[in-house]
């Protein structure tokens, strides 16, 4: 899978969390959000907090690898989390994830 990082960096407004994770909001309409997560390769293992998805979550791993309590998802994986699912994702390597939250996200 090829990702044009130069285009992404030129067109996405990033919010830095100071943990090696940054969030780019691509679109928001009512409670639905489409975002990018960009994670550095040497991020702390607990950079992501446990969180809940009231309306579920779908994400595509564009680069790197994501893993959580339910499995490991390499580049190219499309992952669906059902309504009211709680998880604590982790990443391996430089990771870029495209995420859709139909009804937002809440800290667990």
Predicted regions and their residues:
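Cytosolic regulatory regions built on CNB/CRP/Popeye-like sensor folds
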Residues: 1-5, 69, 108
């Amino acid at each position: 899978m090829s990702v044009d990082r130069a285009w992404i960096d030129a067109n996405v407004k990033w919010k830095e969390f100071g943990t090696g994770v940054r969030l780019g909001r691509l679109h928001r309409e009512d409670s639905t959000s489409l975002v990018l997560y960009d994670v550095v390769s040497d991020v702390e293992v607990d950079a992501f907090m446990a969180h809940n998805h009231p309306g579920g979550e779908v994400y595509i791993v564009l680069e790197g690898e994501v893993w959580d309590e339910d499995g490991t998802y390499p580049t190219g994986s499309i992952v669906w989390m059902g309504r009211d699912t709680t998880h604590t994702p982790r990443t391996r390597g430089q990771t870029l994830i495209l995420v859709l939250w139909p009804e937002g996200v809440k800290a667990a």
